[in-house]
Amino acid sequence: MGLFSWLKRRSERPGRVDPKLLDWRSAWARAVEQPSADAAGRLAEALDTLGFSEEDIEVEREMLDGLRELLDLRRSGDAGLPILETGHRVIGSDRCHFSAPVSMPDEDSQPSGRLLLTSTRAVFVGGARTASIPWHAVGQARHEQRDIILIRKNRENLYRFRCNSFADALRGAFLSRQLVAHGQRAPIPSATRS
């Protein structure tokens, strides 16, 4: 397919998503809430049978890859949270469990930087500032599309970190929930990531 026909097809339905893909995305969202290999397999099969070109379903393929990575992380979670080696000074003596490039779209300057999830806090390093949110102060951690959202217990602050991929958002939100749950309990066992 030529560039012109691709642009023309896209301009015929700007911002519109085929109802079959909307149904698939709803099924994906349900699968993310209760991830299983069976659900991922059914989603992959359903996506293949929809009959769209790979260009038309590249976002859905990325969503499916993110679900698979979440499953891998959950399976390896029996050995504890992954530990990433980082020489970042802001981490200090904390164990780092996640690192990904992100932006903060809700901030006026929309800074880009890196989100680090450590044993004690979430740290954003980028732009003109560093944001540090201790796990004991986080009331809720979740994902929304490619975003990791941390909401403070006092509900006065919401931190939205936009990831470059669904996989990063799903993995980061999962690890954040684990770290929030253990924020005031005994240290979490950790597995070294190779």
Language model region names:
Residues E107-G127:
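Conserved beta-hairpin
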